Structure formats: structure tokens, C-alpha cells
From Swiss-Prot:
Domain of life: Eukaryota
Pfam families listed in its UniProt record: Transferase
Pathway: Secondary metabolite biosynthesis; terpenoid biosynthesis
Note: In A.calidoustus, the austinoid gene cluster lies on a contiguous DNA region, while clusters from E.nidulans and P.brasilianum are split in their respective genomes. Genetic rearrangements provoked variability among the clusters and E.nidulans produces the least number of austionoid derivatives with the end products austinol and dehydroaustinol, while P.brasilianum can produce until acetoxydehydroaustin, and A.calidoustus produces the highest number of identified derivatives.
InterPro entries found in the cross-reference section: CAT-like_dom_sf (IPR023213), Plant_Fungal_Acyltransferase (IPR050317)
Keyword Cell membrane carried by entry: no
Alphabetical keyword list: Acyltransferase, Transferase
Disruption phenotype: Leads to complete loss of production of austin.
Name this polypeptide is given: O-acyltransferase ausP
Chain's gene name: ausP
GO BP of this protein: terpenoid biosynthetic process
Function field: O-acyltransferase; part of the gene cluster that mediates the biosynthesis of calidodehydroaustin, a fungal meroterpenoid. The first step of the pathway is the synthesis of 3,5-dimethylorsellinic acid by the polyketide synthase ausA. 3,5-dimethylorsellinic acid is then prenylated by the polyprenyl transferase ausN. Further epoxidation by the FAD-dependent monooxygenase ausM and cyclization by the probable terpene cyclase ausL lead to the formation of protoaustinoid A.
Amino acid sequence: MEVVRYFTSNQKQPPATGPKDSIVQLPDIPPVYECNVEVALRFDSVLDPEKLQQSLKRLLEIGNWRQLGGRLRRRDTNSDACGYDLHVPVEFTTERPAFIYKTLESPAAVDEHPVACKMPQPTDPNKILFYNVRDALTPSMTRTHHPRKAQEWAESDLPPLSFEQLNFRDGTIILLLFPHILMDATGYGLFLKAWTCVLQGRMDDVPQCCGFSESITDMLCHKTPAESFTWHNHLLKGLDRLRFTARLLWENICGKEERIIRVPGKFITQTRDKTLADLSTSQDSPFVSHSDVLVAWFVRVVLASLNPQHQRTLVLTNAFDIRHMLPPERAYLQNSVFLAHTMLPVGEVVSNPASFLANEIRRSLVRERTEEQVQARCAWAKDVGIMPLLGSSDMLLCNVSNWSKGGLLDLDFGPAAITQRPGPCVPSSILNCSQMRGVTPEYGIILGKDSQDGWWMQWRLSKFCWAMIERELDTINQTR
């Protein structure tokens, strides 16, 4: 195996480590995290880049927040996991800055820019809005090159936090980029919130940052045996895994496309009220969240467009983080996400109202978010491998990631606003520019809720199903 790696490796020699760099060992995580996360936020005020940079510099000099300015380096480790360290300079200089920040000034309006105008913007906040964002998914409007995955970061001497600010006559777009190996969306949201605290002069509200070397899963995995994990007998392996992979390859032949959907808060509230009314006929005190209802409603729309065989199993994974189990006084930035699994026959999902699926989603979250289940899941993963796959060979896999707790649409940059507008200076729209390549299941992200209570989602689905989904959303708009 080492001989094969020698002749097939394209790795470059990493840059020399600074003689006084402190080395922080990152926890091992699955290779799926070796990608970047790239997000574009649109503000309807012009922002002062100097104020944003100065407050960011100040944050990255505080305690373990400094580790965000470290350089990724690969270390020899188990090939099934990402083995990286952070090499943190003893001081940040012009040659080795804590972050990358580029600014572009344009005399044009945002909607006059050939790429910026493609960013979704709510035109009628009372309707379900549907955006084809294919042309807007260009991850940069100014950057010529940046590392695309963790290994490329390790071959550079670049800091992992990158920002591009595009100031227009009537607003600002900020492009945020970081390697996923460092943080999940909620962790990045905690970083952004700390940044706004510094910008707003609320230094006492900046939380202590948990160092990246502290493995959250190691804190938990030794307390409950692996056999206690609810799905420990549902590991997909061997021939069954091969069958599932072949089916997934076939279903990806036509390719996938991404769309953004903005759903009015009033529609989701009304749908939730109806869901609770339905459930109250069989439960004393039913509860489902707005997110449960949003996912259940749209997954049923997706199933109607895909029209899968009813005997197949829908495996709906819902990402949740485990920070609620950790001491609240510190900010835990590192990846802390687990998946709650809802497994149901497709026929049962489509023949029942959305309240049925919403209730099942909530049940899976309640069941798998307990401290005992998370501990058992950590112990089980230690036994079976760092990236197990649960389900059946015939399953229709649909992954959902909820970024709403990251609060990206609550980011208030008011003190940096050059042009003042009523209310807080928060993003008016959001776009996930992360590049998903290769074979993927059906995948959706709840990006968050905006200041007008609209829910933003971004879905990557089979190309052929989008026309039917758009017709269904148009029908809903006409009947409301």
C-alpha cells in the first residue's frame, strides 16, 4: 500500500513550519469534510471593510480564537480519516496574516453586476420563491485561485479563513470561505457572532473558545456501550452496500442541479398549526418544530417528483449538533454534527399527510439527541469506522443539514454600515457556493430564517425533478 501511495500521490512538499509555531492536533474526521464551505451574504447597506477587518484582527488575538489563524498541515495517520494539524504562528504579520481579506469597490448597483445580480433576492416575501442559482454558484467574483480541499490548504501557507467583500453603490456582498475540516455551520456561526460582538464593542460578550485539540467525541464515547446505539444493527456493508452504490450511480446519470427556495414564515406557521391539529387527535401534547414541518413538507414534494417505488425505504438523515451536552460558557467551533435517521417505507410517507412525516422526524431527533444515544453512537463509530452508512440496499437516501442554528442571517454588521437603513444591518439573502461534485444522494440545506421570517433552503436534486417541483410550488402560490 505504501508503494502504491508513493507512485500515485500528487502531494507537494508542505511549506516549512515557522520555528515558533504552536502545533494543535485536530481530531480525526471523515474524508467528506476535506472540502471547503463557501457562503455568500448580501447586505442592502454598504459596509466599511476597514472596520470589519480591524474587529476581526482583534478577535483573532484573543485566547484560543488565535487558532483560527493557524496553517493546516497533514500528519501521518489512519487513511480512513483526515489527519491534520494546525500550525499557529506566534504572531501574525503581513507575510503570515491571521486571515485573507480582499475588497473590491464598484460604482455599479448590485443588480447591474453580471454575477452579483444572480444572487437570490426576495421580490415578493409573501410567496414561495424559487431560484435557479446555477450561474450564481461561481464561488468567487474576484479570487483567481484558492485551495479547494484540505490537502491543498496543507500545501500552502495560507490561513484557513478567507473573505471577499464586494462593495457596490447600494449594498455589499461578502463571500465567506473556510475548510470544513475546521468547523461546521453552527461553529462558524459562533465565530461570526463573536466577530460582531467585537465590532459592536461588546468585548465581555465574546465567549471563551474551546481549543481545536479537544475532541468532543472523545469526551463522550467511553460512557455508553456501542450496542446501545439504536441503529447499530443497520450498518450497510458488503454486497448490500455495493447494491446501494450501484443504484446511486444509476440515479446520478442524469446529473444533479441546485435551486434555492424561500418559503414565507406564515406558510410554515400555518402548516405547523395544521400539523399539530392533526397530531392532537392521537397525542396529548404534540410538538413539532418549524424545521420539522419545513423538511417534511418539502421532502413529500420531492418524493412526488421522483416517483420512487413505494416498497423502497426512505432514509432521511437530519443533521443535529451536540453542543447542548457541553458546558455552555465556551464556544465549540469544531465539527460537532451527528445524523438522526428516519427510516420509513416510501408508500407510507406519500399516503399519509405531511404531519405523519413531521412527527416521525421529531421522534427520531428526540430519540437520537439524548446523551446516552450520542455516547453510544460515538462508541459504535469507533468500532465500525469513522464514516459508516446506515440503511438498506434499496433505500432512497435524502440528507438534510440545518444551518439555522448558525444564525448566518442574523449577522448584524450595523457598526460597519456606511449607508444607514432602518433596523439591524443583517443579510437580505444567502447562497451556499460550496462546490459539490461527483455522485451524491438527494441533499438539502436549511440555510436559515431571514428578518422577514422567510425560510431559505438550498437543494441539490436530480435534474429531471425540478420542473415538476416548480409547478407544484406555483400551484401552492396560486391557491394561497
